[in-house]
Amino acid sequence: MSSAATNHPFSVPRYPSGQTCPAASEHLLVTQGAGQEERDALAAQLGKVRITHLALPDFPSVADLQLVLSTTLKDARVGLRLDLRGDEAFVWPLHALARAAGLLADEIFMSSSPEGTRLVFCVHCATCQPATSAGHLTCTQCGVMLEVRRHFSQRLGAYLGVCADADQPYQGVQP
């Protein structure tokens, strides 16, 4: 057994590509962008399986999309496969909504790119905030300079942000 640290920590999500579930009786595709190419590719892979597509640009807000998704999942039957595509700040709240609606983790496929927005949880004030993939940021709530750790909470859908310098937690912040 090697004592070397792994390059990819266990808690950091991995997003496999191209995995469809041909055994599913219905697919629900939710995309952050228009997603027409993704829908067409999925339809080509699955053949005659029913695909419902919800695209964020078709809704006035993320909250409206979440409401429609929640209603759709409430009426869902066994055999549904949920496919979420977008950045981490988009897919993880939808993942939580789907889990709360009763879907199992194996019934949810997520695809995300590391370049998009992600959520960071500040351990000092318990605020979840959108952030880029940068390693440091200033908390929007408490003003502490945070180091973003390579630890991801699936429950929160966020990375852990801790004080970057305990000796000067408010460096760069003007009183």
From Swiss-Prot:
Transmembrane intervals: none
Coiled-coil region: none
Oligomer and partners: The heme-dependent oxidative N-demethylase (HODM) is a heterotetramer composed of a catalytic alpha subunit, a FMN/2Fe-2S-dependent oxidoreductase beta subunit, a gamma subunit with putative aminotransferase activity, and a delta subunit of unknown function.
Protein's job: Component of the heme-dependent oxidative N-demethylase (HODM) enzyme, that catalyzes the NADPH-dependent oxidation of dimethylamine (DMA) to methylamine (MA) and formaldehyde. Functions in bacterial methylated amine catabolism, linking alkylamine oxidation to the tetrahydrofolate C1 pool. The function of the delta subunit is unknown.
The name this protein goes by in its record: Heme-dependent oxidative N-demethylase delta subunit
Record organism: Ectopseudomonas mendocina (strain ymp)
